Amino acid sequence: PIFSFNSSQIIAFPLSGFTTDWFKALLYQETLHEALTNSLIVAASSSIFATILGTLAARSSSRYNFRGKQFSLTFIMAPLVLPEIIVGVSLLIVLIQLGLPLNLWSVVLGHTLLIMPFSILIMNSAFNNLDISLEEASLDLGETQLGTFRRVILPLVYPGIMASLLLGFTLSLDEFIIAFFLTGTETTLPVYIWSLFRFPKQLPTTMALGTILILVSSVSYTHLRAHETVSH
């Protein structure tokens, strides 16, 4: 962050002087704005899809026993232990073989597969901590399975759903490897930042962008911690 305020384009000590020109330059970089918008779209879409699928998978695994259950869970959780580069290359090969274009939605697909195991772990814990007698009482009172799930179970696991969404959004926003392999002409923010490092003259601007991201992350974390403290 210190070098983002340095008036020189050379990243070295001693500093030449103080300036905020690098931050002002960010306002006029349309490619940066497009990359940020793309990342927000991908992160929001991926976290929502992963949370929906993860909630359904966690509900099925915690509530029902069926043939192939363990194998299915192991297959879904594979991205947790596989290197991201293997996941990215594998998805790239599959998409090319199917003749599908590489765009933001291919990145959404990759990020959804990457985030989904985390969502399942979070929602599994939420469902396992539920009092099953509440569900049974709802059914005994004449509510349907779907109505019970919507009116009783979902409100109880709401904290888990929000945790899954926030974690998924953060992981997707920060992810580089899968986005690098699956993106087309529309780049995400991490890929855009990586491309700037090839041009030394762009380093101060990159440092300024990094400073803003650190500031936003710190403020968000402090706000969440304060909210948790008030809640408790």
Predicted regions and their residues:
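Membrane-interfacial helix termini and adjacent extracytoplasmic/periplasmic loops
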Residues: 11, 15, 20, 69, ...
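Glycine-rich helix-loop "coupling/hinge" segments at transmembrane-helix boundaries
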Residues: 12-16, 176-203
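Single conserved hydrophobic/aromatic residue that forms the stacking wall/gate
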Residues: 223-232
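Membrane-helix interface segments
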Residues: 63-72, 100-104, 145, 159-160, ...
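Transmembrane-helix boundary motif in ABC transporter permease subunits
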Residues: 44-76, 93, 224-225
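Transmembrane alpha-helices
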Residues: 112-113, 120-124, 131-132, 145-174
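Short membrane-interfacial helix/loop motifs at transmembrane-helix boundaries
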Residues: 1-30, 182-184
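A membrane-interface signal for the N-terminal entry of alpha-helical transmembrane segments
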Residues: 35-45, 201-224
